Amino acid sequence: MRRLSGVLLACAVFLIPAFSHGHGDLFAQQAPQKTTFTGDVAVMAYAINPDKTADYEKVIAQLKDALSKSEAPEAKQQLAGWKVIKNATPNPDGSIVYIHIISPVVKEADYSIMNNIYNAVKDPAEQKAVFDMYRGAMKQALFVIQGPMVADLSK
């Protein structure tokens, strides 16, 4: 009996803090996850819903605007090395592939599309609208490749 009461007391000690805050507080305390790269070059590919390519391109335009207005010194470097191309032909399922090519990678810079937009767009309703547009356009992330430059044939 003494052992059971000890176990119950221990559980109560751990559970009370978990229930003492609202869910909003728990989510608000979590910092958004950064997307960083360690290689010299990064390539990311996303399949976009065919009827939402204009929405995706609006999000990319907002990303460019956010980085260009940012006071962070690495933002200008990110702009200089971040290119986005659109595949000319659709995938068999109709989705359109967008490839992000980042060269050179700015070490420790955040390459999260939404984090960078949120740094510029402070209104929660507008943030939600941009996120919904981004999420609605995205069929799936295909891959991320990063690594060192092995050969630069232009030199």
Q: What is each of the regions a protein language model found here?
A:
Residues 8-25:
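Bacterial N-terminal signal peptides
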Residues 21-32, 152:
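Sec-dependent signal peptide cleavage junction
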Residues 27-39, 68-98:
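Short, glycine- and small/hydrophobic-rich beta-strand elements in well-ordered beta-sheets
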Residues 37-50:
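Acidic/histidine-rich, surface-exposed loop or edge segments in extracytoplasmic proteins
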Residues 41, 53, 57-60, 64, ...:
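Extracytoplasmic/secreted envelope proteins and their assembly/folding machinery
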Residues 48-50, 60-62, 88, 100-106:
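A mature extracytoplasmic/lumenal domain signature
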Residues 64-80, 94-95, 101-155:
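An amphipathic, aromatic/His-enriched active-site/gating alpha helix that lines ligand/cofactor pockets
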